[in-house]
UniProtKB/Swiss-Prot annotation:
Catalytic activity: 3-methyl-2-oxobutanoate + (6R)-5,10-methylene-5,6,7,8-tetrahydrofolate + H2O = 2-dehydropantoate + (6S)-5,6,7,8-tetrahydrofolate
Residues where Mg(2+) binds: 45, 84, 114
Keyword annotations from UniProtKB, A to Z: Cytoplasm, Magnesium, Metal-binding, Pantothenate biosynthesis, Transferase
Protein name: 3-methyl-2-oxobutanoate hydroxymethyltransferase
Originating organism: Photobacterium profundum (strain SS9)
Gene designation: panB
NCBIfam families on file: panB (TIGR00222), PRK00311.1 (NF001452)
Primary site of residence: cytoplasm
Amino acid sequence: MKKITINDLMTWKHEGRKFASITAYDASFAQLFEQQEVPVLLVGDSLGMVLQGKPDTLPVSVSDIAYHTRCVRAGSPNTLLMADMPFMSYSTPEQACESAAELMRAGANMVKLEGGAWLAETITKLTERAVPVCAHLGLTPQSVNIFGGYKVQGRDSDHAAQMVKDAILLKNAGAQIILLECVPASLAERITKAVEVPVIGIGAGNVTDGQILVMHDMFGISANYMPRFSKNYLAETGDMRTAVSKYLEEVEAGTFPGPQHTFE
């Protein structure tokens, strides 16, 4: 697989070509994903739940993400690699730059931050310092205690309108990817059309430019439960490589996620 860059994702958006991405945490799975030509991988703070057995993502540290980023980069030299900025690692622009520097040195091509309009200054500071940014909107798991649980976001008109404004603001601040989690498909479509950068969805319908799944959900090995927006591809195929290929095919064809994986 040739080396994937943000320019490739931009081209695919303009061409209407959908793409898939997966979370990864170690070199072996990263290598498997690259061999199947998964273009984008994310070292997610979801590792706190799926690897460390924590109830949420809040205990994850920058050092945790950096360690797993090094592992994933070792196994996938050509994928576009995003790394999550953990809870309270970007409270100020200055702290964000320090945290991002550690993750970029570990091998990330881009960092992902959760939040809305308040992130604009931080995103600008990061991009001015050559750190590409993915802005995560909708259900932001680091805010689970504010939301009172893992709930669909943007169902009321005011919240939806604000999310569209936030996406445009953060794109204008320098974000090169927008990630939408657990939002109605109609809202995801509005945002995807409103911004010129690629939009990746998880629980946001098949209307976004790309999709992402947590690998443990995709392989049906999550310890607790299967989110509605996910799909156990391993159960359907019986083989991990075939499972990844089927996921890629269905995303590119627009058949995943289907209505049963989508919120309205």
